[in-house]
Amino acid sequence: MAFLSRHGLALSLSDLEQFLAGAPGIRHNSVLVTIDDGHLSTWSIARPILKRHHIPAVAFVTPGMVGRKRGFDERISESYAGWSELRELTASGVQVASHSMSHRSLGAMSSSQVREEAAMSKTMLEDRLGVEVGAFAYPYGTRADFTTATGQILRDVGYRFAFTSQHGPISRGVNHWELPRIKIEGGEPLWMFRLATRGGLDQWKWIDRSLWRLQASPGR
């Protein structure tokens, strides 16, 4: 975060929206920090660091998991932030957005189920936190976890864009309902993070897409 702050690379969600709308003046290697799931560590660890370095960020939260000790993956022992922690998170400048209601994959759901997941999570976050929720991140976020129809439902419910977990940078003209991201693990060295901001990991998107095509091929 110190690196982003020092080089003026951090974007807000509003900045990204302006970029997607064609606004000039945004550096090509700018970064929007996103954090999925709403674990307690988003409040206890990430929030102070982001605040110290004046970094805007987006926390994608699953309302059905708020305050729980365990969630969708029993292998993860970390608790989830409660509503009071999420209010402190928004007060500190972190934007809270939707990660569905239950963290189930939307890819195999019916249209009515997708609509319910998207609408309920949006409404609950807005009502409990007093914020406007315009962004969504697909649970798991692989190509199997959303469809073109999913994006249309999100649009109808009132979202303006949605993030996947597919690897790649965001460019103008990209599908607003299939925004890629670049995953950075906590243990990765700073040089790799710097490389990512300079486009050095962009080529991995082709590997990501090729693997999906292999997995989706008949007989596999």
Predicted regions and their residues:
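C-terminal active-site subregion of NodB/CE4 polysaccharide deacetylases
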Residues: 1-34, 40-41, 104, 108-220
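Histidine/lysine/aspartate-rich catalytic loop segments that bind and position anionic ligands
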Residues: 81-86, 90-116
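Active-site beta->alpha N-cap acidic-glycine motif
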Residues: 3-92
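Active-site-proximal beta-strand/loop segments in catalytic clefts of secreted hydrolases
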Residues: 60-63, 100-101, 139
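Hydrophobic anchor at the start of a short beta-strand
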Residues: 57, 96, 133
